[in-house]
A protein has these predicted regions:
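Beta-strand elements of repeat-based all-beta scaffolds
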Residues: 1-378, 382-495, 499-516, 520-537, ...
Length: 733
């Protein structure tokens, strides 16, 4: 048998493969590094050296090791961080227990783990979590298809199949009554096995019952079994055409009556998209938007030409990884390059944003041998440190304010987890417990407790929809209750004061009416595409909306019949707004959608006011001119706003710390105001050279608890369990 030793792309990029004498692949090498594999006598991979470690240490590098039993089952995975994953199997080779690294005990070579049970055919029938709780059970038919599944909270789903094995019905239990009630979804197929209808029951029914009404979605296909129409019974419709290779050449969508979104696609001989042409309706003189694409010999997208002529260029390395993206808007002076560098494992090490005037904003990331990000450094040099447990869960996050380079550690936000990976506790860098959580067997939070003991309890419907939210304490009270219809669409909310709000919904679950406790009712109507076409307030006043084929508002008619008009450019940016009195605002934007020109005038086009914006090559505003006044903006080497000027005179200047927060503001007279922050990044002090000073204190939930002024005045705040200010007290020193 022949094995490839080298693969060379049309661009000359090479990947080399090494084998042993029996044809086992031992190495994979490219321009970025090498992955080394080792095998045992039974041809099982026993080690995988991480590419970064291999580049430093060769065959002595670190990586992941695998151990097997005599049946060839992998029983241990030894990770480079010292973690061990243990696996156990039955006589048929089915994994019956999986112990995660954090639960593994080396002395017993075991630990608490997930357990799996199987039937005589080797099909999984039960899953238990490390605590012994049943998370899922499964039942099958003779063809191995799931007939019934139940989760740990009792949610039951039943499946029915036709004689060809196609699923034709789902029944989801929504009420544990006697008899139980189910939500039904039905599927219909054509003779080729294509799904031609999805039907959602509008009423809850007993098991195997038939709802009185259905919400139906219809599908049709061409002779090649390509999906060509999707529609509902209320006017929504999508249509597709294809070429002989199966590429979509036309996509048409109904937006509103008489307005369709029509997009044409063109491809090259390789089947790669080269042009996207969107017909635009209901948008004045702009009637089409054309986007063009170009590729290299490997099929990587190398150039995008936007409808307004801007260009996006992309370059790749030998492994088809993006190395540079250049955004070019010549008309508006934008020429931004973003360059990427990778390690041998393909992780992004550096990102550099480059401008034509020498600007370079570089950020970097470091990774461990499990490819987890451990350090992120921003352009100013601020480091955010991440530490993980052996199950790859984030256990500590250290901000630039807490990071200590000497120890490569520091005070940070800490997290603890349960055996299923749910976050149990959050502790801030000051050691204060911010929040504690507990979960049901569906991993939904059921209890939330903050640092002050405020306890919020959440309960859920059988199918997982939230049922009510309660606040426990001296007097337990309901904060909110929710009601749903058979489709599990929300139909009512009762607030903490027992005021009910009712919702009318259409078949898609869109709110068509809201009824308030005082008898006031609001109404909503929609286009076939699902956008609001009309709103009716409690007094019967209506506001109407019309849309263009881009799906953006083109007209708004208010309660008095006055109309606002909106027009957009080829890229969807607002280009014209005419208000109810005829006043006009014309706008032009750059490639990033930022305004570069605005002209405001009255209904006759007179009394104009022109505003312009200028940007540097990175797309940062450097000058704004409005009503005869000019404002200039200057940035520091790290991308932060350094100075704002008006007609050449300094208005204000800023200094920032490594975390990007302001540490000093200097006014035109040179008066300096300084800012300090605590280890959590909260503003803790404001002061100046004249002796003025303000200090801020916070509680564990980041709410201001006191403000102390230099003259001795102190303001203290207390809060209720919902975070509302309960008391505010100011005292003189």
């Amino acid at each position: 048998r022949a094995y490839p030793s080298r693969v060379i792309t049309p661009k000359g990029e090479e990947t080399a493969y090494g084998y042993d004498t029996v044809g086992r692949r031992l190495s994979i090498s490219n321009t970025y590094g090498t992955v080394e594999l080792a095998y045992n006598s039974r041809n099982f991979v026993t080690s995988r050296i991480h590419p970064v470690s291999y580049a430093l240490k060769g065959e002595e590098g670190e990586g992941t090791r695998y151990e097997y039993n005599s049946d060839g089952n992998c029983i241990r995975i030894l990770y480079p961080d010292g973690g061990v994953e243990r696996r156990f199997y039955d006589a048929d080779g089915n994994m019956i227990k999986q112990v995660q690294p954090e639960s593994y005990d080396a002395d017993s070579d075991d630990g608490n783990g997930y357990r799996y049970a199987y039937d005589a055919c080797g099909r999984m029938t039960e899953v238990q979590d490390p605590g012994g709780n049943i998370l899922h059970t499964y039942e099958y038919n003779g063809h191995g298809q799931i007939l019934r599944e139940v989760d740990g909270e009792g949610k039951e789903v039943l499946y029915t199949y036709n004689d060809l094995g196609w699923k034709i019905r789902e029944q989801i239990k929504v009420q544990e009554t006697d008899p139980a009630l189910y939500r039904v979804i039905a599927y219909t197929y054509d003779s080729q096995g294509n799904k031609v209808e999805e039907a959602y029951g509008q009423q809850e029914v007993e098991r195997d019952g038939e709802p009185d009404g259905w919400h139906r979605i219809h599908f049709s296909y061409d002779k090649n079994n390509h999906l060509n129409v999707v529609k509902d019974d209320f006017g929504a419709k999508m249509r597709y055409d294809y070429d002989c290779l199966g590429n979509v050449t036309l996509e048409e969508r109904v937006i509103a009556d008489g307005v369709h979104s029509v997009i044409h696609y063109a491809y090259n001989k390789n089947g790669w998209l080269v042009q996207r042409t969107e017909e635009i309706q209901g948008n004045g003189p702009v009637q089409a938007a054309v986007t063009r694409y170009a590729y290299d010999a490997n099929g990587n997208l190398t150039k995008i030409t936007t409808p307004k002529g801007s260009e996006i260029h992309r370059s790749y390395d030998a492994d088809d990884r993006l190395t540079e993206e250049r955004v070019l808007d010549r008309k508006n002076g934008i020429d931004r390059r973003v360059q990427y560098a990778y390690d041998a494992a393909g992780n992004v090490l550096k990102q550099a944003i480059l401008g034509t005037d020498g600007e370079c904003l570089e950020s970097s990331t470091r990774y461990d041998l499990k490819d987890r990000a451990t350090h992120r450094t921003n352009p100013a040099g601020g480091v955010t440190r991440y530490l993980y447990d052996r199950n790859d869960r984030l256990r500590k996050e250290i901000s630039p304010y807490g990071y200590e380079p000497e120890s490569d550690d520091g005070a940070g936000v800490s997290y603890t987890y349960d055996s299923r990976g749910n976050r149990l506790r959050t502790t801030n860098a000051l050691g204060e417990v911010v929040q504690e959580l507990s979960y049901n067997l569906r991993n939904q939070p059921v209890i939330q407790k903050d640092t002050f003991g405020n306890r919020t309890e959440l309960s859920y419907e059988l199918d997982g929809k939230i049922k009510d939210v309660r606040r426990s304490g001296n007097h337990q009270r309901i904060l909110q209750q929710y009601e749903y219809n058979a489709r599990r669409q929300i139909t009512g909310v009762v607030d903490g004061n027992r005021n009910p709000i009712s919702y009318d919904v259409d078949s898609w679950g869109r709110i068509t009416g809201i009824g308030f406790a005082d008898g006031v009712k609001e109404g909503y109507e929609y286009t076939p595409a699902g956008q609001i076409s009309r709103t009716i307030d409690g007094n019967g006043n209506a506001v109407q909306y019309r849309y263009n084929s881009l799906g953006k508002v083109s007209e708004r008619t208010d309660q008095l019949g006055f109309t606002e008009t909106f027009r957009y450019d080829e890229e969807g940016n607002l280009s014209l707004h005419i208000d109810r009195d005829g006043r006009q605002l014309q706008r032009a934007c750059n490639v990033f959608g930022q305004p570069v020109y605005e002209k405001a005038s009255d209904a006759e086009g007179k009394h104009t006011n022109i505003s312009t914006w200028h940007y540097d090559s990175l797309g940062r505003v450097t000058r704004a001119v409005c009503d005869g006044k000019s404002y200039e903006y200057i940035y520091d080497a790290y991308g932060n706003l350094k100075e704002k000027r008006s007609n050449g005179k300094r208005l204000v200047s800023y200094t920032h710390d490594r975390a990007g927060q302001i540490t000093e503001i200097r006014d035109p007279a040179g008066v300096s105001t300084r800012y300090e922050y605590d280890i959590l990044g909260r503003r803790s002090r404001i002061f100046n050279d004249d002796g003025l000073e303000v200090r801020y204190g916070y509680n564990a939930l980041n709410r201001i608890c006191d403000i102390r002024y230099g003259n001795g005045v102190k303001t203290a705040y207390t809060y209720d369990g919902d975070g509302n200010v309960r008391t505010l007290e100011t005292r003189a020193g």
